[in-house]
UniProtKB/Swiss-Prot annotation:
[4Fe-4S] cluster 1 binds at residues 8, 11, 14, 45. Ferredoxins are iron-sulfur proteins that transfer electrons in a wide variety of metabolic reactions. Pfam families: Fer4. Residues 2-25, 26-54 form the 4Fe-4S ferredoxin-type domain. It comes from the Bacteria. It comes from Peptoniphilus asaccharolyticus (Peptostreptococcus asaccharolyticus). This is Ferredoxin. InterPro entries: 4Fe4S_Fe-S-bd, 4Fe4S_Fe_S_CS, PSI_iron-sulfur_center.
Length: 54
């Protein structure tokens, strides 16, 4: 699963790319149980906030 770290600027670039609906807030969040590891969020993020969970 991907997780979004504290460098998230909530720009919204990832939201339309995510097939499992990233949750919007002051920092965006990905539901680890729903994430399908597609990496679409990471490929469009301007600050590199989404990363594969260890």
């Amino acid at each position: 699963a991907y997780v979004i770290n504290d460098s998230c600027i909530a720009c919204g670039a990832c939201k339309p790319e995510c097939p499992v609906n990233i949750q919007q807030g002051s920092i965006y969040a990905i539901d680890a149980d729903s994430c399908i590891d597609c990496g679409s969020c990471a490929s469009v993020c301007p600050v590199g906030a989404p990363n594969p969970e260890d």
